[in-house]
């Protein structure tokens, strides 16, 4: 007796690679429903295969470090929030498990909000260590955004409960006596930096949503501090708040105008 289409779909889910799917007896079944199920499973497996291949490519920096020193403790570091008009810059330092396989990791800007949340939850549950570092709007104004970002990153490293031996950093060098590799667009090239990017983004977005409750009218829950139309309109109506960066335009001009300078 032939299997039902539903049964075939269930059996196809037990096939976990394209080679096995190509060799499956179900390819000989000419029923339209079976062929559609095979095509659907093939698409899923191709997507999974692409994720694995991309992930393996993003482990290249980590693998090179470990090939030289198998005992290396690698820490990925990234930040979010350099460009907004309001809110802190948030950095995250992450030390992944040795057997990590967080497929789907990528630059946080390329990952959907839903997938970013899932990845963040998985990372928080399974990483060896992670910690955040924050530089406030006041510190950004007193220093500059570059130096404030360095401060946030160093605080994240200091807050770790594990001491790293090699830092992988997204386009930044830190004045620390620890081996480090600065990688341009590192959040798209290193799984460790991508993990830090995801966690930093989720952490800062959560903070900005909370700030939206404290300061309604600026649309922080959507713009997370960036200079969107709704945010700028909120500034015109309500004025600036302590979380605004006074060294960033147009906030700077508004402050000077009020001081009549």
Swiss-Prot record:
Localization annotation: Cytoplasm
Annotated ranges, domain RNase H type-2: 72-260
Keywords: Cytoplasm, Endonuclease, Hydrolase, Manganese, Metal-binding, Nuclease
UniProt GO MF annotations: manganese ion binding; RNA binding; RNA-DNA hybrid ribonuclease activity
EC number from the UniProt entry: 3.1.26.4
InterPro entries: RNase_HII (IPR022898), RNase_HII/HIII (IPR001352), RNase_HII/HIII_dom (IPR024567), RNaseH-like_sf (IPR012337), RNaseH_sf (IPR036397)
Taxonomy, superkingdom: Bacteria
Cofactor remark from the record: Manganese or magnesium. Binds 1 divalent metal ion per monomer in the absence of substrate. May bind a second metal ion after substrate binding.
BP terms from Gene Ontology: DNA replication, removal of RNA primer; mismatch repair
SUPFAM superfamilies: Ribonuclease H-like
One Pfam family recorded for the sequence: RNase_HII
Chain sites annotated for binding a divalent metal cation: 78-79, 170
Gene Ontology cellular-component annotations: cytoplasm; ribonuclease H2 complex
Catalytic activity, reaction form: Endonucleolytic cleavage to 5'-phosphomonoester
Cofactor(s) listed in the protein's UniProt record: Mn(2+); Mg(2+)
Function: Endonuclease that specifically degrades the RNA of RNA-DNA hybrids.
Protein family per UniProt: Belongs to the RNase HII family.
Family annotation (PANTHER family): RIBONUCLEASE H2 SUBUNIT A (PTHR10954), RIBONUCLEASE HII (PTHR10954:SF18)
Name of the protein described by the UniProt record: Ribonuclease HII
Organism: Staphylococcus carnosus (strain TM300)
């Amino acid at each position: 007796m032939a299997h039902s289409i539903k049964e075939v779909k269930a059996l196809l889910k037990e096939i976990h690679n394209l080679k096995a799917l190509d060799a499956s007896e179900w390819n000989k079944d000419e029923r339209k429903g079976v062929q559609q199920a095979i095509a659907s499973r093939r698409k899923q497996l191709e997507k999974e295969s692409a994720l694995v291949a991309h992930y393996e490519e993003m482990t290249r920096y980590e693998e090179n470090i470990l090939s030289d020193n198998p005992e290396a403790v690698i820490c990925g570091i990234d930040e979010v929030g350099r460009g907004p008009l309001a809110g802190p810059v948030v950095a995250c330092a992450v030390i992944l498990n040795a057997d990590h396989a967080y497929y789907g990791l990528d630059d946080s800007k390329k990952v959907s909000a839903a997938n970013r949340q899932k990845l963040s939850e998985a990372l928080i549950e399974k990483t060896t260590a992670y910690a955040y570092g924050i530089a406030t709007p006041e510190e950004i104004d007193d220093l500059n955004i570059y130096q404030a970002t360095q401060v946030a990153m160093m605080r994240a490293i200091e807050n770790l409960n594990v001491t790293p031996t090699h830092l992988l950093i997204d386009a930044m060098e830190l004045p620390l006596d620890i081996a480090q590799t600065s990688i341009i667009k590192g959040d798209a090239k290193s799984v460790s930096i991508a993990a830090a990017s995801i966690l930093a983004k989720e952490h800062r977005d959560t903070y900005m949503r909370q700030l939206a409750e404290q300061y309604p009218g600026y649309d922080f829950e959507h713009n997370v501090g960036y200079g969107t139309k709704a945010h700028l309109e909120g500034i015109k109506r309500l004025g600036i708040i302590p979380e605004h960066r006074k060294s960033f335009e147009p906030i700077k001009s508004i402050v000077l105008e009020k001081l009549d300078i």
